[in-house]
Regions:
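His/Asp/Glu-enriched short active-site or ligand-binding loop at hydrolase and phosphoryl-transfer sites
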Residues: 84, 211-232
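Short helix-initiation/N-cap motifs at beta->coil->alpha
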Residues: 41-43, 94-105, 228-240
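Extracytoplasmic ligand-binding site segments that recognize negatively charged/polar headgroups
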Residues: 122-126, 138-154, 188-213, 259-261
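Bacterial Sec-exported substrate-binding components of ABC uptake systems
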Residues: 2-61, 162-194, 255, 309-320
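A short, structured surface patch at a secondary-structure boundary
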Residues: 59-110, 114-119, 222
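Proline-aspartate-enriched helix->loop->beta-strand connector
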Residues: 96, 104-117, 135, 239-253
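Structured C-terminal subdomain patch of bacterial secreted/periplasmic proteins
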Residues: 157, 166, 253-320
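Short secondary-structure boundary segments
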Residues: 59, 119-120, 250, 254-258
């Protein structure tokens, strides 16, 4: 059934819903201030170099934000979901497997002085071996817009290029303000954000990354009123009964991959079930598939662009 969530989907949601929250606990003045103590998203206190020289990043967001803050990488996850300039910059950087399946042996052999990872089970499993090898690893989560800015600022401190990080932040905030200003004086639309795989569909809450952006733009996320049974990682199972009652004015659809099969399945659902046909969004042709590069994974430095895309879709009454 369409409203079932599998264990595999939950892991994917953890990957999408989010990747990197930095929380600084304190700093140690040790060895001429070469070490700092931070608390990662898993609540672990980790002693890391103040300015690491050999960094391995295990997800797209870490790669994007660290490089954009002036850093260079010794190793990285194999991923194509990067901004063009970052993708070019890391083209020759050795890969250490995929985000959900990092090659631990390769990572240890590189002898990095810092590993940037996501707060997900796949990366939690790396901790014992890396700690034993004396390699610090930060498990990070990013669930909203503000956490992107915080992480950029943190990475600027690590790379010693705080000005470059500040410039990136200023650019993002400018795009953010433009997107928000475009909503001024316009009625707040009722919005449904869907996350889809070939197996099932879920509704995104405001605690999800895309849900946070919708809320910042003044959209009313109807999913926040849904039954929270089965909720995990900012998503709840899709309920067609709920959709029929909520009658969203805009439906935004995110696929977990660039595979057209998910989109085809969703279109078939829209055409074949009265719950969809009765919604304002479907009747007014305001159902939009969100760009994979900006919404299927955390957009990192492209979050300002993601805001601009959302603003246009939420507040345009034109049929798409």
């Amino acid at each position: 059934m369409i409203n079932r969530i599998s264990g595999a989907v939950i892991v994917i949601l953890l990957l999408v819903g989010g990747f990197m929250l930095y929380s600084q606990d304190s700093r140690e003045t040790m060895k001429n201030e070469t070490v700092r103590l931070v608390t990662d998203s898993a609540g672990r206190q980790v002693s890391i170099p103040a300015h690491p020289k050999k960094v391995v990043a295990l997800n797209a967001s870490s790669i994007d934000l660290y490089v954009s803050a002036g850093g260079s990488l010794a190793g990285r996850a194999a991923t194509e979901t990067l901004p063009p300039d970052v993708k070019a910059a890391v083209q020759q950087v050795p890969t250490v497997g995929l985000t959900p399946n990092p090659d631990l042996e390769k990572i240890v052999a590189m002898k990095p002085d810092l590993v940037l990872a996501a707060n997900i089970p796949y990366h939690h499993a790396l901790v014992p071996v890396l700690e034993k090898a004396g390699i610090p690893i930060l498990l990070q989560t990013m669930d909203n817009y503000q956490q992107i800015l915080d992480t950029l600022r943190f990475y600027g401190e690590l790379t010693g290029q705080t000005d470059k990080a500040a410039s990136q932040i200023a650019q993002i905030e400018k795009q953010y303000q433009t997107a928000v200003q475009n909503t001024a004086g316009k009625p707040a639309p009722k919005v449904l954000v869907l996350w889809g795989t070939t197996e099932s569909f879920s509704m995104a809450l405001s605690s999800s990354f895309t849900g946070d952006l919708v809320k910042r733009l003044g959209g009313i996320n109807v999913s926040d009123q849904a039954d929270k049974n089965g909720a995990m990682a900012g998503y709840v199972p899709l309920s067609l009964e709920f959709v029929a009652k909520a009658s969203p004015e805009v439906i935004l659809f995110i696929t977990h991959s660039s595979d057209d099969k998910v989109e085809e399945k969703f279109k078939n659902e829209l055409a074949g079930h009265p719950a969809w046909q009765g919604s304002l969004a479907v009747r007014q042709n305001r159902v939009h598939k969100l760009p994979y590069q900006l919404f299927a994974v955390n957009p990192g430095t492209q979050v300002g662009k993601a805001m601009e895309v959302l603003s246009g879709l939420l507040y345009s009454s034109e049929a798409k």
